[in-house]
């Protein structure tokens, strides 16, 4: 698994973005190290731009 980008939010959580080969090759954004398949902190996007935009929102949110 190749990490495309990492960001840290205001709660000091590190988020990672990668291509999820097991989920239709969609881009996944999740808390680093979270391996729970049913995690509420795992988000899938169709394009890398959508995933990066979401990560930027996470980084800027309070």
Which stretches of residues belong to each language-model region?
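A short, exposed loop/beta-hairpin motif centered on an aromatic-Gly-Thr core
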Residues: 7, 33-53, 58
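Extended rod-forming repeat segments used as scaffolds/tethers
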Residues: 27, 57-60
